[in-house]
Amino acid sequence: MDRSRTSSQGRDVLPPRGDEGRISPSLDKEKSPGPEDQPDAPPDGGLTAWLVVVGAWCTSFCSFGWVNSVGIFQNYYESHLLKHLSSSTISWIPSLQIFFMFAMGPIVGKLYDTFGARYLIIGGTFFHVFGLMMASISTQYYQLLLSQGICSAIGAAAIFQPALSAVSAWFNRKRGIAFATLSTGSSVGGVIFPIMVDRLIAKVGFGWSMRISAFMILFLLGIAIVTVKARRPPPQGPKPSGVQLLQPFKEPVFIVTLLGYMLLTYGVFIPINYVIVQAVASGMNADLASYLVPMLNGASLFGRLGAGFMSDRYGRYNIFIVMCIVAGVLVLALWIPATSNAPIIVFATLFGFASGAYVSLSPALIAQISPLKEVGYRTGLLFLFASVGGLTTSPIAGAILQNAGGDYTHMKIFSGVMLLGGTAFIITARIVGTGLKLVVKY
C-alpha cells in the first residue's frame, strides 16, 4: 500500500494527507491536497458532527459499557442464581453477549450502508431493553441465555455499530479523537453499571436491578435516536455484487488486521471477565473485588482518550501496536504473580489504561484502510472475526481453569500470549502497508 493509500484495484481508500508519511509535519513541506480540499470531505467538526459523537457516546455507554460489566454478573451467577452450575457453563452467558454483539457486524453494517443509522438504533433499542426486561424475570439458565446472552446482545450490536459508522462520515483528520471520545462511553458505563448493579442487587434484588438498568439504557438511547444520523442519504444504486462483497478479502492489510484483532479479543476479555473471580479466590474481600472492573474501566477511559489523541498525531496503527504490547506485557509480568490486593489493583488499573486502544482505535484502523462507502460493511467484518474470540474466550478460559485445578496461571498465560500474538499480526499489517519504515505515520 503506497502513501496515497489505494487498494489493489487502484481505488481511492482515503484522501491523502500532507503529513501522512511523517511523524513531524515539518519534515514534509510539500503538502498534498488534504481532505478538507475535497468537495465531499467530512466537515471534521461543527455542532451537528459533535452531536453525532454525543449520541454515539450514549450507544457506547449502553452497549460495550454494559458488556464490560460482565464480570459482576459472572461473579453473581456463580455465587447465587446459578451456583449449581460450573464456571465454564455460566461463562456462556457473557460469551454469547460478546459473540452476538460482534457477529451481527456484517448484517448491521450492510443495513447501515443501505438504510442509515436511525432505524437501526430504534430497532436495537427495542431488543436491548426487551432482553434486559426478560432477564429480570428469568430464574433458569436457558432463560438468561436467551434474554441476556442473545436478545439484549443483538440489540446492543444494532445500536453501537451504526453510530461508529456515522461518526466515520463526519470526521477525517480528527477521526482518532472523535472515536476515542465516543468510546469513553463504554468506560463510563463499565464504571457505573458494576457498582450500580452490585448495590441494587443488595437493596432491591436482581430483578429490579435489571429493570432499573433497562430504563436507564432506554433514556440514553432516546438521546442517540435523536442525535445520530448519516451525513449523506443512503445510496440508491444497485446492490453490491458478490465480487464487491469479497473485495476486502483480497487486500492483505485488511485480512491481517482482522486476524490480529480476533486474537486480541481472546486476550482482552479474559481479565475483564475473570479479574473479580480471581481476586476473590486470592483472598480479596468481595466488596473490594467488586470495584476492580470499575477501576479497570475508569482507567480505560483515559487510555482511550490518550490513544485517540496520540493516534491522530503519530498514526493509528502505531499507537494501537504500542498499547497492545503494553497490555500483553502487563498480563504476563504483573497479573501472573499477583496474588495479593495491591498488585491485583495495580494490574486492573494499568491493564484498563493499556487495553483502551482495543475499543477506541479499532474502528479508526478499518476506516483508515477502507473506502468511506464501505466502512460500515468492513467494520462489521472486523466485528464478525472478533465474535469468534468473543464466543469462545470465556469457555476456553473456564476449561483451562478447571483442568488446572483452579490455578489461574495457565489462563493468564493464554491471555498474555493471545495479546502479543494478535499484536504481531497488527505489526505485520503495518509492514505490509508501509514497508519496514519505523518513523512512518500509519
Curated annotation (Swiss-Prot):
Places the protein is found: Cell membrane
Biased composition, class Polar residues, residue ranges: 1-10
Pathways per UniProt: Secondary metabolite biosynthesis
Knockout consequences: Leads to the production of a mixture of ferriaspergillin analogs with varying combinations of aspergillic acid and hydroxyaspergillic acid.
Compositional bias of kind Basic and acidic residues: 17-34
Chain segments annotated as transmembrane: 47-67, 89-109, 119-139, 150-170, 177-197, 206-226, 252-272, 288-307, 319-339, 342-362, 381-401, 413-433
Gene induction: Expressed during the earliest stages of maize kernel infection.
Function as written in the Swiss-Prot or TrEMBL entry: MFS transporter; part of the gene cluster that mediates the biosynthesis of aspergillic acid. Probably involved in aspergillic acid metabolism and transport.
Protein's name in the database: MFS transporter asaE
Organism: Aspergillus flavus (strain ATCC 200026 / FGSC A1120 / IAM 13836 / NRRL 3357 / JCM 12722 / SRRC 167)
UniProt gene name: asaE
